[in-house]
A protein has these predicted regions:
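Short beta-strand-plus-loop segments that form exposed binding edges in beta-rich domains
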Residues: 479-486
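Catalytic beta-strand/loop cores that center a nucleophilic Ser/Cys/Thr
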Residues: 223-224, 237-335, 351-357, 366-368, ...
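Short alpha-beta junction capping motif
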Residues: 190-238, 319, 343-346, 581
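Intrinsically disordered, low-complexity Pro/Gly/Ser/Thr-rich segments with frequent PxxP/GP/PP motifs
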Residues: 95-144
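Short glycine/proline/serine/threonine-rich loop/turn segments at secondary-structure transition edges
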Residues: 78-81, 142-150, 334
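Short beta-strand elements
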Residues: 160-178
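Disordered, acidic Ser/Thr/Pro-rich linker "stalks" and the adjacent N-terminal cap
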Residues: 361-417, 425-438, 444-447, 453-461, ...
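Substrate-binding clefts and catalytic carboxylate motifs of secreted carbohydrate-active enzymes
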Residues: 1-91, 95-102
Length: 581
């Protein structure tokens, strides 16, 4: 009674429709090593212990005590009678390293006794789900900071132990200053060197030219389109069957590196990374030369694309030392503040000696203004195409009708334009409407003049079309002559004895398709104007200035709010004192 059950596609990896790593077991029904049978039974058994935990990352500054309701889901042969649940909070084994001239050396693995423990009230449990078993209360003052703990809950059922475990990361944001820092701020140092923190590419370049230590936080919207977003959850099925711009297959972290000395992590990450890598782009480090950097946090791209990327790396730029990240370390989360503090502590130390050498020109290949069309005030003459000007590859436009498709992009003022960036639709496995042949014209001296014509290769990658020469204009006419999915002709999928094939539409050969043939299609996710170098630099500086002004306004508002809160607290204390008197 009351059992709802569940359904799995398969227990092992599926071998049809491309490689689909959806199974608990591999294609040969062997363990992948991801989970043991005992771990599987913790959440998939006739009796399961459950804990309602709001977050695996806990900020002690905001939570003096944590309450965790415990529940029992039981569908055994008979109800449970007089069962007592035991719990304990255990510190996970700490791996201690020493760092010297010859790198890191494993010192020891330290196992700690339980930090807290207790027992819940004895109860009976029916054949039902989500039955309340009581509540665990954790006093945060008894728990050491910047550590990962395991909450272990167990009970004895019919002679066997039923148990479940959950990881908990404990931080304290009040002890992790600064949480947010303005561009170019100087992090105080105990050594002769200070660390400068910035998200301003020009300021970063200046500081590096001066030989400084720089933490460069590259904003999402300033990152090259060659650098796709990463994802905490793995890709579903595979990117051949269900392509997306963001793909993920886990992470590799150099967890023994001193940059993580006060930020607990395993080599394959953990739940404390989930919010850190949401809305984050993976930096394509093959553009820099993978041997030139030390890749501290590497997201694993899905194997059909297999980009070599990084979320955090260190290198030398001339005589300067650079730590570069695309992770938003300024977000309001205790794990972000803890990671930032751990990185800064390392950067201030003598251990911060990056080995690889990278030029600023190489680093610049990671930068691109995503919303350049918004910055320019660009408009398109067909409202149905406006989404391709939003700079977001995860939206797209789709036109049907017949080739060629032409549209005009216009800006309020004239600009020196050097080319166009076209990014195809990212989520269609048949590359529907992907541009092949094109014609680009500029409005010059009162007439349309050709500035480029050619063909593109079929790819999900951004395609940058350079003009024959820079043009000074306020209007560009873009014409799609044909696409890869149907080069100039309608097509359809047909079943043949040995499989499915995409064929050019021939109504005489397939009369049943008359009146049902698909129309010629053009699609795009992003179309951006590429500016000449001086124009692009001016736009960069304008947006950075606007960002700093916005940050300053936010700081003023936050300071005012803090002051108001202090005044309210003071008023309440005064009122309480008057009442007491």
């Amino acid at each position: 009674p009351y059992i709802y059950g569940f359904e799995l596609l398969d227990l092992h990896d599926y071998l049809g429709q491309g490689t689909a790593l959806v199974g608990i077991l591999d294609p040969f029904w062997d363990s992948k090593g991801y989970v043991t049978p005992n771990e599987w039974r913790q959440f998939c058994d006739e009796t399961v212990l459950l804990a309602r935990i709001k977050s695996y990352c806990i900020d002690r500054a905001k939570n003096a005590t944590i309450s965790i309701p415990i529940e029992v889901s039981h569908f055994g042969r008979a109800p449970l009678q007089s069962v007592r649940i035991h719990w304990q909070l255990e510190q996970q084994p700490v791996t201690e390293y020493t760092y010297g001239e010859h790198g890191k050396t494993l010192t020891q693995i330290v196992f700690q006794p339980p930090v807290l423990c207790g027992t819940l009230k004895q109860r009976d449990y029916a054949l039902e789900k989500n039955q309340s078993a009581g509540c665990i209360y954790l006093n945060m003052e008894d728990i050491e900071l910047n550590r990962v703990y395991t909450l272990h809950v167990s009970m004895k059922v019919n002679g066997r132990i039923v148990e479940n475990t959950w990881p908990l990361w404990i931080f304290d944001s009040s002890k992790l200053n600064p949480v947010s820092t303005p561009d170019g701020s100087k992090a105080e140092s105990d050594t002769h060197e200070a660390v400068f923190i910035t998200s301003d590419r020009f300021q970063a370049e200046t500081l590096l030219n001066e030989g400084k230590r720089v933490l460069f936080e590259l904003p999402y919207e300033d990152t090259s389109y060659d650098c796709p977003p990463v994802r905490f959850n793995p890709s579903f099925w595979n990117s051949q069957m269900g392509p997306t711009w963001a793909r993920g297959m886990g992470m590799i972290i150099q967890n023994a590196h001193p940059a993580f000395a006060s930020f607990p992590t395993t080599a394959d990450g953990g739940w404390q990374w989930q919010s850190l890598i949401e809305n984050v782009r993976g930096l394509r480090v093959e553009k820099l030369g993978c041997d030139c950097i030390t890749n501290l946090v590497q997201p694993i791209d899905e194997w059909n694309r297999n980009n070599k990327m990084s979320l955090l790396f260190e290198c030398q730029v001339g005589t300067a030392r650079l730590m570069m990240t695309s992770i938003n370390l300024e977000q309001d989360a205790p794990q972000a503040a803890a990671l930032k503090k751990s990185i800064l502590s390392y950067m201030k130390s003598d251990a911060f000696e990056p080995q690889g050498q990278v030029s600023w020109k190489q680093l610049s290949s990671l930068f691109e203004i995503n919303d350049v069309m918004k910055e320019l005030g660009a408009k398109i003459d067909d409202d149905s195409l406006s989404a391709c000007l939003d700079g977001n590859p995860q939206t797209f436009v789709r036109l049907t009708g017949g080739y060629p498709y032409s549209f005009i992009i216009q800006t309020p003022q004239k600009h020196n334009i050097s080319g166009i960036l076209y990014m195809p639709r990212q989520n269609h496995r048949e590359h529907e409407g992907e541009l092949r042949s094109y014609l680009i014209e500029a409005w010059l001296d009162g007439t349309w003049k050709q500035v480029q014509k050619g063909k593109l290769s079929s790819s999900y990658e951004p395609q940058r079309i350079a003009f024959l020469h820079d043009v000074y204009t306020d209007r560009i006419r873009f014409t799609a002559l044909d696409t890869f999915s149907a080069p100039g002709k309608s097509c359809f999928w047909a079943m043949e004895p040995d499989g499915w094939y995409q064929k050019e539409a021939d109504p005489d050969a397939y009369p049943e398709l008359k009146g049902q043939l698909p129309q010629d299609i053009f699609s795009a996710s992003v179309i951006n104007l590429l500016l000449a170098e001086e124009e692009e630099t001016a736009v960069w500086k304008k947006r950075i200035k606007q960002r700093k002004l916005a940050h300053l306004e936010d700081s003023k508002k936050n300071s005012k709010q803090v002051l108001n809160n202090l005044q309210n607290v003071t008023s309440e204390k005064s009122a309480t004192a008057e009442i007491d008197n």
